[in-house]
Amino acid sequence: MSYIKKLRARLDSGEISAVELTKEYLAKIKEQDKRINSVITLCEAEALKEAEDADAIISAGKQGLLTGIPILHKDLFCTKGIRTTAASKMLDNFVAPYDSTVTKNCKDQGMVTLGKLNMDEFAMGSTNEYSYYGAVSNPWDLERVPGGSSGGSAAAVAAGFAPISTGSDTGGSVRQPASFCGLTAMKPSYGSTSRFGMVAFASSFDQAGIFGHYAEDVALMLDAIAGECEFDSTCVGVKQNHFTQDLEKDISGKVIGVDESLIKDLPAQIQEAVSKTLDNFKKLGAEIKSVKVPDLKEALSTYYIITPAEAAANLARYDGIRYGYRNPEARDLDELYRKSRTDGFGAEVKRRIMIGNYVLASSQYDSYYNKSQQLRKVMTDQINQIFTQVDAIFMPASPSEAFKKGDKLDPVSAYLSDIYTIPANISGLPAIAFPIGFANNLPVGGQLMAKAFNDNILTQMVVQYQKHYGIEEFILQQARI
């Protein structure tokens, strides 16, 4: 099941041209995004030019799988000649002089960039309420959040503004929004995709990810954007068909680990969806094995010490001098720094910078940052030990369905919504979220996590799951939004 392959067939048969397809999506964005606020920058002229180029390639019979396929990018991937804001006043007028590796790889495949997507400022948030350009609405219920930080990426695909979108995942920022919006999304193994040209939040956690309706589309796109990059020393590269190599194989004999203690306190409807999902995996031949994962609250605390520290270092570059917002009223250098950063950053970003600088202070370093790094290593070892017994670990993607805007403005309450997704980021492991049911008529997602660079096991398992148990109910309901 693949939207990309369906669109490929329509384009290759001449049923529709790339320009016509692009115009359809652009028109839908212009007509409907006023309610959702998922797009920061619409790239109409650029998209139509790229679509014309794609049509010429198709006419010459030289097209690839992705030639002419429209895509939307989270607005932290640099796009040459198009502004890249990271949803911050600090970068409101920043036009990137180069393409990120992710966007370049998409362009090289002949894809059509429709626009840049809203997000939590500098990817710091779980609700997409922390954006200089306003909150994003969940297409399933406009009063609710789409999740974050890649809320615009999830909302746009759920609303039908593009068949696919890019996102980034530092602590669950593709998987939690996918759960809230009824989509499939994947954070690949750390190092499988390049971070070059991706606005940094926490460099040892950040990883590009993909949103789509179907796991097959997510796998196809990850194959397209993954690979070695000379500009990112952490990018180890993966073989060409790393994510798609086993999609057609059944999953009989695969072992899925489940920690029951993570499920027993969930709302009843989510517990029911989880139970049904595990039963379906058993029907496909998988074995369910009881395991014990590391304490998730400890993982959450570790994450919210290390990532602010990395953020404080990464965001030190925004000083009002080299690029970004500059306060026009500053009278001296100190005032320029202070006013530019005070005005240019939003409240959540400033909160995390302050936390980061505090834990990095010489008086606190050993008590907080150093101990958190030690705990990160211990947790990674514990999780990897589980994979000596199982092929994948299953857990919910979020402890709840999408909540209403304003319900979790308390930072700690919002941070807890990442509790199931953070372990994969702490340990650099691949994880995929996919729809498993409904709670209060809103979608909820499950999550599978695998050993590092066993990404193909995850895509295989979810492709086979969706092949036999489908997600058409999610697609049909979204079509009526």
Swiss-Prot record:
It comes from the Bacteria. One of its GO terms (cellular component) is glutamyl-tRNA(Gln) amidotransferase complex. The active site is at residues 74, 149, 173. Keywords: ATP-binding, Ligase, Nucleotide-binding, Protein biosynthesis. Transmembrane segments: none annotated. Its EC number is 6.3.5.7. Pfam families: Amidase. Allows the formation of correctly charged Gln-tRNA(Gln) through the transamidation of misacylated Glu-tRNA(Gln) in organisms which lack glutaminyl-tRNA synthetase. The reaction takes place in the presence of glutamine and ATP through an activated gamma-phospho-Glu-tRNA(Gln). Belongs to the amidase family. GatA subfamily. This is Glutamyl-tRNA(Gln) amidotransferase subunit A. It comes from Francisella tularensis subsp. mediasiatica (strain FSC147). The gene is gatA.
